[in-house]
Amino acid sequence: MFVKTGDKVKVISGKDKGKEGTIIKAMPKEGRVVVEGINTIKKHVKPNAQNPNGGIVDTEASIDASNVMLIDPSNNEATRVGYKVVDGKKVRVSKKTGESIDK
């Protein structure tokens, strides 16, 4: 998967198109990601230890990883991701600038 937890991404399709956020959770086997503040849903929750009253809670649902683009840290623009082998390690590279994304 081309994105990791903690990466800043831009949504490129769907109801939240154009919004930016940070990846909270990446699910490579399903090909999905959860982005902070994106694709929020209202969930009915029974009373429990964390939420003694229960009620309706806003939470983020996952979206397909193909619907997000990584934001290049060097110029803060959305970019496609390529890969290069540097010192025997596979690193992610911005297609726009050619710079390494992984530090």
Swiss-Prot record:
UniProt xrefs under PROSITE patterns: RIBOSOMAL_L24 (PS01108)
Domain of life: Bacteria
Keywords: Ribonucleoprotein, Ribosomal protein, RNA-binding, rRNA-binding
Any one GO cellular component localisation term in the record: ribosome
GO molecular function: rRNA binding; structural constituent of ribosome
InterPro entries: KOW, Rib_uL2_dom2, Ribosomal_uL24, Ribosomal_uL24_CS, Ribosomal_uL24_KOW, Translation_prot_SH3-like_sf
Family note: Belongs to the universal ribosomal protein uL24 family.
NCBIfam families per the UniProt record, alphabetical: rplX_bact (TIGR01079)
Description of how the protein assembles with itself and partners: Part of the 50S ribosomal subunit.
PANTHER family: MITOCHONDRIAL RIBOSOMAL PROTEIN L24
Name of protein: Large ribosomal subunit protein uL24
